[in-house]
Amino acid sequence: MLTKIIAKASCKTNVPRPESEICDSMADVALKAIEKAKLTIDDIESIGIGVPGAVNPKTGVIEYSANLFFHNWQVVKMMEERLNTKICVENDANAAALGEYLAGSAKGAKNAIAITLGTGIGGGIIINGKIYSGSNYAGAELGHMVIVKDGKECACGRKGCWEAYASATGLINLTKQEILKENFDFSYMLKSCDGDINKVTGKTAFDAVLAGDANAKTVIDEY
């Protein structure tokens, strides 16, 4: 099996926005990557899409995605209309787990679990070489295990999910909370984002720790 990456392209998701606009962006990115690889869409037998949330790969529908703010998104149908080739969709962490199983750190294993960290926390489970999705296609949504009773609110609507604490989104929210504390005289964290709290990223607190910001250390210690 050929597993070499031969071209890359990317763009910002910029959610929330309409499904059609996101599909337009994904189609553009796919075509750019194909062009970089010196191929055409006619050379492509199929395209795979990895998406956070509960994904039904049989129907091609994203049933629910907390991070993309969509319900019952018919992504396969919409993308096939744009690219005129076979499209497959799977939960992003499931796809990552399968990739590790086929060609990565889990190659040669019978069973595997992968955990992805980014905007949220995802999980993928491989059993006997096959993706385990569970009865509701959310069997490996490890980020939505409740670790703190009545804890921080999560994007999924529950409270105390692991994702609310340990994802990049959780870190950004924690950084903002520390910046906004009362009697906060000076913060390298705030200075590094030009005084605009909306510019806080997952790197803000780490960069501030290296600059000697004690409040940033508090953020990292809690994270």
Model-derived segments and spans:
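Glycine-rich phosphate-binding loop and adjoining helix at the ATP-binding site
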Residues: 13-27, 43-47, 53-111
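Short beta-strand-to-turn element immediately C-terminal to the catalytic PLP-Schiff-base lysine
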Residues: 99-100, 124-128, 132-134, 146-148
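Short glycine-aspartate micro-motif
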Residues: 43-48, 112-116, 122-124, 155
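N-terminal phosphate-binding loop and adjacent alpha-helix
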Residues: 5-42, 77, 211, 218
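Glycine-rich phosphate-binding loop plus the immediately following alpha-helix
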Residues: 89-93, 147-184
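Gly/Thr-rich phosphate-binding beta-strand-loop-beta motif of the actin/hexokinase/Hsp70
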Residues: 1-6, 114-131
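A mobile "lid/hinge" subdomain adjacent to the ATP/sugar-phosphate binding pocket shared
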Residues: 166-223
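Phosphate/pyrophosphate-binding loops at sites that engage ATP/ADP/AMP, CoA/4′-phosphopantetheine
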Residues: 26-47, 86-87, 181, 185, ...
